[in-house]
Amino acid sequence: MSALFTTRRAMLKGAVGLGGLAAIPAWARAMLHGPIRQGFDEVSGRVIDLAVGQGAIEVAGRSGHAFAVNGSVPGPLVRLKEGEAVTLRVANHLAQDTSIHWHGLLLPFQFDGVPGVSFPGIKPGETFVYELPALRQSGTYWWHSHSNLQEQAGHYGPIIIDPAGPDPVQADRDYVLLLSEFSPLHPHTIMAKLKKGEEYFNRQKTSWTDDYRLSGSDRRMWAGMRMMPTDIADVTGSTYTYLINGHAPEDSLEYLFSPGERVRLRIINGSAMSFFNIRIPGVRMSVVQADGKNVRPIEVDEFQIGTAETYDIVVEPTTEAHTIVAEAMDRSGMAVATLASRAGARAPVPSLRDPVLLTMTDMGHGGMDHSGGDHSNMGHAPSTGGMDHGSMKMRDTSSLPPNVAVGPGIDMVSANPADRMGDPGLGLDNVGHKVLTYRDLTALEPNDDPRKPSRHMQIHLTGNMERYMWSFDGRKFNAVADQPIRFAYNERVRVKLVNDTMMAHPIHLHGHFFELVNGADRMHQPQKHTVIVQPGGSATFDLTADEPGDWAFHCHLLYHMHAGMFQIVTVASPDGEA
């Protein structure tokens, strides 16, 4: 039996990496008993100490519960160096288990930080020591808890890995923008409300008397499906305050620059449930990195960032101040900061745009929506013209492959799941300026593996929105926990993700990067660790399974993952052990 998998079994019994709290310095322990700070410090070095605590926090005049690492929300910026090893000692001062997952990092699976998959978790009063060997990458990443719903309540922070050699991205200033949310509700309360009624937080519900331009037949169609065309996000600005680096819009967060400078902004979506549309009115953005991987620079005016994605951009501000806008995809709120040439300089903050409405394309009928008009920016949906929606058989499961379990966990099937890699994201298809799509991304350097895939597989993203059930292939994780998706070591696989739901899902694979099949030549397909699969559509990636071990594979919408949209991927060791 390989030593690798012997280690895995020992880890899950809690036998490796645990120590006492004595290793944590007094300053870290003391911070847990003081007020929780908003914003973060930077930690670096060959040995880094992180202490997980909890307490009360106040955001925009509302109080709530928070998990704080080293006394702050977000937790500290962990700054590392490509080619160097690092030891991270994480002490748990909570009364419950905790963990840290190093999102996007290539490392031995024993230190990936997913309880029950790669290690047993960190018990109250214990310390876990993450031993990361020489880092094989550079770029912008982040870390977060993978225990319970702690991530929602502040247990997250940024990572920067500086390159060993010259950085191809040249800038005069370098800033982190970590996007997240705050709610005064406890995360388990939010989950309970979603289980009782998926539309609980949808404050933009349509009715027969509202001003959304829906025909009577369209309204009857949506009512018959027990759905709403405004059902864009499960949790919205009705409870969330949207944050940048832990700060609400009224905190007036600013990033200083001098005229003529190039400013690098490392944008991390560390939210639990929110997609954001990023723009800086009056300033074009050059996208230079996606999920920590350098891409050929592409100039855009706006881009959508899904939960768990990262994008690095370079901007050249031209006036005294510019507003950085991170508008929630459903347009129920925004996070705001300012690029300022002097302290206190401000630019106008744009109003929220009209709400987005779902369309026939989002229902998996991509070839049937020929309106061609702007049905998003103006808050209008194209009329379906009295189509026979019954004939579309949106709930007809006969077209599903045999590996998909049909049952109450599936309330929709995409009849025509078109490849939506060229879509800019819900609400951005006709906004009158350049919006980034996955098809715009091209790897800056050639990919390492020139082989064509030797195997093709398809995974369906499934759910029942009304009952708040989410899964892969119709099976929640508790039904397949002992049936991982298996890959041979170094196997080259093409994976097609088919979204049989009306929600966008950010799908994340731990421990690997995959290449988006986005129209670029095979050697320059962009590498990512997280991909958005648009409603009713599909997305495809190529994977080289060269990181042995057990890895989490899941939707990064926290409550979807918690409800069952989670699987384990097992990559065999080089000697064939699995």
Model features per residue range: what roles?
Residues 2-6, 13-307, 313-314, 344-392, ...:
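Histidine-centered copper-binding motifs that mark active-site loops
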Residues 31-44, 48, 399-419, 435:
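N-terminal pre-domain segments of enzymes
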Residues 50, 459, 495, 507-510, ...:
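Hydrophobic, well-ordered secondary-structure elements that form the walls
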Residues 51-52, 212-225, 440-466:
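Predominantly extracellular/luminal regions of secreted and cell-surface proteins
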Residues 149-152, 321-349, 556-564:
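Terminal connector regions
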Residues 310, 314-321, 537, 544-549:
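Eukaryote-biased detector of low-complexity, proline/serine/threonine-rich segments
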Residues 457-459, 463-468, 482-514:
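C-terminal substrate/ligand-recognition segments
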Residues 516-546, 552, 561, 570:
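C-terminal soluble interaction/assembly domains
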